[in-house]
Amino acid sequence: MTAIRFVAMPTTDAERLWNGGRDAYDRLPETIVSDGPGHPCRHCLQNIDAGQELLVFAYRPFPELQPYAETGPIFLHKQPCARYAAEEIMPPMLTTSRDFIVRGYSENDRIVYGTGAVTEIGDIPAYGKELLGRSDIAYVHVRSARNNCFQCRIDKVKAPVLAETGA
């Protein structure tokens, strides 16, 4: 069976924004104050608490521009936070809605047609494993079922390479 991990936005992307960098549209992030649930941070994968400042910006979780490189608004704590590390466990922010879109992408970062499905939260790990068990799927996105905003990525857990011991 395919083992999976839930992957947050890379720390290098978050640090660039925390340090005054620009978003995917070459704009500075906007700062707003959270009014409570509904502002999931894509770096720590936790909801941003009411009263905390957050950054809103355009994000493109793909390595290059191409027709399938969806770009959309996401949130990030304004103050640096630790990147989500319990990758084998479904992140807390994915328990705040009844369902999400789960969709597979190929090695060349294109949507694999027929894989996108509005998926109940309890079924996300199983559907992610099912998709990643296919040879044509390189990774999976979890996106908002209401607004299509990127939430996190699901990757296969790769087996460690056996080190030569010299024995």
What are these regions (language model features)?
Residues 87-88, 114, 153-154:
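A short secondary-structure junction signal
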Residues 1, 93-112:
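N-terminal non-globular leader segments, chiefly Sec-dependent signal peptides
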Residues 150-158, 165:
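C-terminal edge-of-domain segments
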Residues 144-149:
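Short Gly/Ser/Thr- and Asp/Glu-enriched loop/turn motifs at secondary-structure junctions
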